Amino acid sequence: MNTSVELRSTRAQRREARRRAHHLVTADEHSLADLEMFLATLPLCASGRIFIEVPDASDIGVIDAPGRMTVTWLARGQRSGAPGSGRSCAPGQALARATCAWADEMMCDGEIETHVTLLGGYLGTADIVDHLTTTLDIAPALIHAPERFGLLPADR
């Protein structure tokens, strides 16, 4: 009789462990193919947030993502640059702002492990890596960015 209860308990623990691992994924118009390949490797039960920056609202498309992941498209053409500057949004700026704001709110307590995959351009990715590692003290081992950017230690 205990076996049935233990089995259910073990299943519940495994289910809870899968649900607790979140993903934070970023991309831009140049990395959409990489994003689609990455999303195809995730299990259907994956959860988390995907931020995609594109030049204009007309560039927004459909991404095949797991059902528990939220996709947010960020059109630079409809956003401003630095507050009060009157400038237009530079490449990577909207992506960095949205990702850092989400991370500040959702990754502040470290209760849920979040795997970070940054596929966007260098400028936005550099700002995000800096914010995650210095402000939020996220371990570099949980962050994946293109090696060509040289933003993370090679021995992580």
Go through the PLM ranges and name each one.
Residues 1-156:
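Extended, composition-driven regions rather than compact fold-specific motifs
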